[in-house]
């Protein structure tokens, strides 16, 4: 998509009313991981080079200045800690309550990292966990809710296991032989976890039970890739509180809850570019604070936000309530031979309408959007 100067100027003028806050940053190398370290900092890591930088970035102080923004000069992200991985970083997660990161790349290992305190600016690798399966490259990772730090991880269904970080001891394995690739995985509560494969199937497991429940799609197109997002409250035991969204590379979307994973309570089709099925940055995410809002990216240089409140069992093609086009309007995108594609986006854990997004051109944005209906 070629962006003209006039179109870019028009977007800039529109953005003055479309955002409460909009801060743009340029990374030296693009990232496809954005991991929250709390309310005011994130971790990012490169994926394009043999040696990849891992950074902890403080969000712009101006974002938190409220009515005193005019008195705050800090508009940029600030590097707080940094380190280097000897391989591209495919997945990165933070262990809650610690200064520990876990990453995976193109080797069949997990790397454990320590983020220094106030007396050090270094992110240092402290141990490597060797995975037995030769196919365990680029493992998806999610933190466990156990007393000692653990991670659930795997690149294909049969490889998924729960591992204790301090010892490398395997605490649980998924009792299913399947070579299907993992699209994502996440804990619902302290014991129950959900896995989505790239063919759209869901698996529900429990660390207290060696078996898993398998929920394949009724109709599956082998040419499609699927991504998923889970919205849950670990303090809630009611299955209806956990919403699952699945999105295919053709734009087909399924919404389910844990009471009946076989039958989605809603399915719809969103508009996506025809060439979008070739990329692997597809991302769907529920808003943690706003009820029934979810976001989609990875098809082009845009992040779209949808309100699912009025979606029915067979909804017609819904329109986003907001679209962030900043990455395709950036100077880097205009000067590039290929259009920028959003590689990752993430909602702020406590600010209802604040998101971060990153793109293939190295751009990193934090933005607080305005809902033209509710914010009038």
UniProtKB/Swiss-Prot annotation:
Mind listing the GO molecular function terms for this protein? protein-macromolecule adaptor activity
Q: Which domain of life is it from?
A: Eukaryota
Q: Which InterPro entries match?
A: WD40/YVTN_repeat-like_dom_sf (IPR015943), WD40_repeat_dom_sf (IPR036322), WD40_rpt (IPR001680), Wdr73 (IPR042795)
Region spans: Disordered:
316-336
Ordered alphabetically, the record's keywords are: Cytoplasm, Cytoskeleton, Repeat, WD repeat
* One record GO biological process: cytoplasmic microtubule organization
Q: Name one GO cellular component term.
A: spindle pole
- Which pairs of Cys residues are joined through disulfide bonds in the record? none
Specify whether Lyase is a keyword of the entry.
no
Question: What Pfam families does the entry give?
Answer: WD40
WD repeat segments: 84-123, 276-316, 337-376
Function field = Component of a multiprotein complex required for the assembly of the RNA endonuclease module of the integrator complex. Associates with ints9 and ints11 in the cytoplasm, stabilizing the ints9-ints11 heterodimer and blocking the active site of ints11. Brat1 then joins the complex and plugs the active site of ints11, leading to wdr73 release and nuclear import of ints9 and ints11.
Per the record, the similarity remark reads:
Belongs to the WD repeat WDR73 family.
Protein's UniProt name: Integrator complex assembly factor WDR73
